[in-house]
Design a protein with these regions (language model features):
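Short interface patches used for recognition in eukaryotic signaling and trafficking proteins
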Residues: 23-27, 53-54, 66-69, 241-243
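Amphipathic alpha-helical packing elements
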Residues: 14, 18, 39-95
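Extended, charged/polar low-complexity intrinsically disordered regions
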Residues: 82, 89-292
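Subunit-assembly interface segments of extracellular/virion macromolecular structures
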Residues: 25-28, 32-36, 42, 60
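Extended non-catalytic scaffold regions that mediate assembly and binding
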Residues: 10-24, 59, 127
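Intrinsically disordered, low-complexity terminal segments enriched in Ser/Thr
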Residues: 1-9
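Charged/polar interaction segments and conserved charged motifs
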Residues: 1-2, 30, 54
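Extended helix-rich, non-globular scaffold segments
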Residues: 10, 29-33, 78
Length: 292
């Protein structure tokens, strides 16, 4: 083997005791070149293997080669690869497994029941537990798909709940587990969708004869912004305060956009001033999209 060849070369060098004589021994150059050539062949084969895995599950491109090798070699023991969650999944701190600990005596694979965000430590229950069966690139793709399905389901519920509650209450509403019903990013998305919908409705009202429609809508936007500002003056935990502050940022942007529409006397939704804005929309098929 190449390891044996290198070991013999090193032992010979030690026995010779002279670096010049050791390096000029007959056949040494050819031997080392052969080892280097075979090593390059192994490296190329390994690269092709890893590229094949990355083609199946593209998020492996965000994992270093050493991490990916460790992940693939321990794929049959999912508990050992959870430490790579942050590298594989965007903004995800860890996955919660059932059972939570590795049992060497059990041949059953665990299931993912929840994922925890690394920002704000938000916890989201999977819409359905994901069994970690098969190869890592296969079951991690299933985890990613279920994460997306989970967030889509949460968004649908959030959008439906929005008009049934006061806005601040909707933003901070908690479930039985004392966790917010919506991930903060989903709340921002749902709010942005209603803002876009309301602006379009305002343009329709103006076209129908309500010349003060945008002025009236600005009053609503400012009122919503003031409600959030007042909420920051109350006792809030860090998580809820962060949710409120991020919503204030978006509401301030919405107010500025409406001010610009008023200042430039925009009367139609087809005007460049409005069409150039990034808009959150919910398509008829339930897909959330960003439109410009």
């Amino acid at each position: 083997t190449h390891t044996h060849t290198l070991s013999l070369s090193l032992l010979s060098a030690v026995a010779t005791g002279n670096i010049c004589e050791s390096c000029n021994k007959a056949g040494l150059t050819d031997s080392l070149n052969s080892v280097a050539g075979d090593l390059d062949l192994c490296k190329n084969s390994l690269k092709e293997f890893l590229d094949g895995k990355r083609a199946i599950f593209p998020r492996f491109y965000f994992v270093s080669e050493a991490q990916l090798l460790d992940l693939l070699s321990n794929g049959s023991t999912p508990h050992k690869i959870i430490k790579y969650t942050t590298a594989v999944f965007l903004a995800c701190k860890t996955l919660v497994l059932d059972p939570p600990t590795y049992d060497p005596s059990s041949h059953a694979r665990p299931k993912v029941t929840r994922f925890i965000a690394c920002v704000g430590v938000e916890q989201n229950d999977m819409v359905a537990p994901v069994p970690l069966e098969g190869k890592p690139e296969q079951y991690l793709q299933s985890v990613l798909d279920t994460m997306i399905d989970t967030l889509k389901a949460q968004l649908k519920v959030s959008v439906e709940r929005y008009p049934t509650q006061p806005r601040v209450e909707w933003l901070l509403h908690q479930g039985a587990n004392k966790e917010p019903l919506d991930a903060a990013q989903l709340a921002l998305l749902a709010s942005g969708m209603y803002y876009v919908k309301e602006v379009y409705k305002t343009f329709e009202d103006m076209a129908a004869g309500n010349s003060q429609g945008m002025v009236q809508y600005r009053e609503k936007v400012v009122s919503q912004l003031n409600d959030l500002i007042r909420k920051t003056r109350t006792q809030l935990c860090k998580r809820d305060r962060t949710r409120v502050m991020t919503m204030i940022t978006l509401d301030a942007h919405a107010r500025d956009c409406v001010d610009k529409l008023l200042r430039e006397n925009v009367m139609e939704a087809s005007a460049f001033q409005w069409m150039s804005q990034l808009k959150c929309k919910l398509e008829a098929n339930g897909e959330a999209v960003f439109d410009i």
